[in-house]
Each structure stands twice: as structure tokens, then as C-alpha cells.
């Protein structure tokens, strides 16, 4: 007879606890890089759109992740991640 495999993996914390911890980490990181008024407006928009639901929590997590990714990719002054802006040589020596 076939049997379902036993769950031998590590104990995982519940999804809602993990999600709320992730949201708090993203919010604390976002406050370092964006004006508080922007973040407050974003939270207000999410609350008006989704109310106090898990969909709203997931939406704000997704938006904050995207904002932070783009912010770092463009080149945050506080981060080593991002596009390195190279100075162009005036004599054109760097052209190939």
C-alpha cells in the first residue's frame, strides 16, 4: 500500500507570523530610504483599497519589495548594491 510521506522537515512558523515579521522588516527598511509621508500615503491607499485583510498585507509587502528593489537598483547612497556610475573620459579613451 502507498503511504503519504512523513513530514520530516523542520518545524515552520505559521504563515501569518512570518508575513507580519516580513512586513515589519520591510517597513523599518523603507523608513530609512523614503519620506514618512510617502509611506503613510501608501499605507492609507492599501487600507482604503483592501481594508484590514491579509490581501492588504500581501499587497503592501509586494509594493515595498518592489520599491526597495528599484531604489537599490538605481543606486541608493546608503547601499553598495546598484548601478555603478562611471565617469566618462573627456578624450573618448573609454570608447571601443
From Swiss-Prot:
<keyword id="KW-0946">Virion</keyword>
<comment type="function">
    <text>During virus replication, may deplete host UNG protein, and incude G2-M cell cycle arrest. Acts by targeting specific host proteins for degradation by the 26S proteasome, through association with the cellular CUL4A-DDB1 E3 ligase complex by direct interaction with host VPRPB/DCAF-1. Cell cycle arrest reportedly occurs within hours of infection and is not blocked by antiviral agents, suggesting that it is initiated by the VPR carried into the virion. Additionally, VPR induces apoptosis in a cell cycle dependent manner suggesting that these two effects are mechanistically linked.</text>
</comment>
<feature type="region of interest" description="Homooligomerization">
    <location>
        <begin position="1"/>
        <end position="42"/>
    </location>
</feature>
<protein>
    <recommendedName>
        <fullName>Protein Vpr</fullName>
    </recommendedName>
</protein>
<dbReference type="GO" id="GO:0006351">
    <property type="term" value="P:DNA-templated transcription"/>
</dbReference>
<keyword id="KW-1163">Viral penetration into host nucleus</keyword>
<keyword id="KW-0407">Ion channel</keyword>
<dbReference type="GO" id="GO:0043655">
    <property type="term" value="C:host extracellular space"/>
</dbReference>
<comment type="function">
    <text>During virus entry, plays a role in the transport of the viral pre-integration (PIC) complex to the host nucleus. This function is crucial for viral infection of non-dividing macrophages. May act directly at the nuclear pore complex, by binding nucleoporins phenylalanine-glycine (FG)-repeat regions.</text>
</comment>
<keyword id="KW-0805">Transcription regulation</keyword>
<dbReference type="GO" id="GO:0034220">
    <property type="term" value="P:monoatomic ion transmembrane transport"/>
</dbReference>
<keyword id="KW-0010">Activator</keyword>
<dbReference type="GO" id="GO:0006355">
    <property type="term" value="P:regulation of DNA-templated transcription"/>
</dbReference>
<keyword id="KW-0053">Apoptosis</keyword>
<keyword id="KW-1160">Virus entry into host cell</keyword>
<dbReference type="GO" id="GO:0075732">
    <property type="term" value="P:viral penetration into host nucleus"/>
</dbReference>
<keyword id="KW-0945">Host-virus interaction</keyword>
<feature type="modified residue" description="Phosphoserine; by host">
    <location>
        <position position="94"/>
    </location>
</feature>
<keyword id="KW-0813">Transport</keyword>
<keyword id="KW-1048">Host nucleus</keyword>
<keyword id="KW-0406">Ion transport</keyword>
<comment type="subunit">
    <text>Homooligomer, may form homodimer. Interacts with p6-gag region of the Pr55 Gag precursor protein through a (Leu-X-X)4 motif near the C-terminus of the P6gag protein. Interacts with host UNG. May interact with host RAD23A/HHR23A. Interacts with host VPRBP/DCAF1, leading to hijack the CUL4A-RBX1-DDB1-DCAF1/VPRBP complex, mediating ubiquitination of host proteins such as TERT and ZGPAT and arrest of the cell cycle in G2 phase.</text>
</comment>
<keyword id="KW-0131">Cell cycle</keyword>
<dbReference type="GO" id="GO:0046718">
    <property type="term" value="P:symbiont entry into host cell"/>
</dbReference>
<dbReference type="GO" id="GO:0044423">
    <property type="term" value="C:virion component"/>
</dbReference>
<keyword id="KW-0597">Phosphoprotein</keyword>
<dbReference type="GO" id="GO:0051260">
    <property type="term" value="P:protein homooligomerization"/>
</dbReference>
<dbReference type="GO" id="GO:0042025">
    <property type="term" value="C:host cell nucleus"/>
</dbReference>
<comment type="similarity">
    <text>Belongs to the HIV-1 VPR protein family.</text>
</comment>
<feature type="modified residue" description="Phosphoserine; by host">
    <location>
        <position position="96"/>
    </location>
</feature>
<dbReference type="InterPro" id="IPR000012">
    <property type="entry name" value="RetroV_VpR/X"/>
</dbReference>
<keyword id="KW-0804">Transcription</keyword>
<keyword id="KW-1121">Modulation of host cell cycle by virus</keyword>
<feature type="modified residue" description="Phosphoserine; by host">
    <location>
        <position position="79"/>
    </location>
</feature>
<dbReference type="GO" id="GO:0052151">
    <property type="term" value="P:symbiont-mediated activation of host apoptosis"/>
</dbReference>
<dbReference type="GO" id="GO:0043657">
    <property type="term" value="C:host cell"/>
</dbReference>
<dbReference type="GO" id="GO:0039592">
    <property type="term" value="P:symbiont-mediated arrest of host cell cycle during G2/M transition"/>
</dbReference>
<dbReference type="Pfam" id="PF00522">
    <property type="entry name" value="VPR"/>
</dbReference>
<keyword id="KW-1079">Host G2/M cell cycle arrest by virus</keyword>
<keyword id="KW-0014">AIDS</keyword>
Amino acid at each position: 500500500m502507498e503511504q503519504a510521506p512523513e513530514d520530516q522537515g523542520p518545524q515552520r512558523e505559521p504563515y501569518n507570523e512570518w508575513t507580519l515579521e516580513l512586513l515589519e522588516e520591510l517597513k523599518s527598511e523603507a523608513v530609512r530610504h523614503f519620506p514618512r509621508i510617502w509611506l503613510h500615503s501608501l499605507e492609507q491607499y492599501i487600507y482604503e483599497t483592501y481594508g484590514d485583510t491579509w490581501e492588504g498585507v500581501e499587497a503592501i509587502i509586494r509594493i515595498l519589495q518592489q520599491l526597495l528593489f528599484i531604489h537599490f537598483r538605481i543606486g541608493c547612497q546608503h547601499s553598495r548594491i546598484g548601478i555603478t556610475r562611471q565617469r566618462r573620459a573627456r578624450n573618448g579613451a573609454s570608447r571601443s
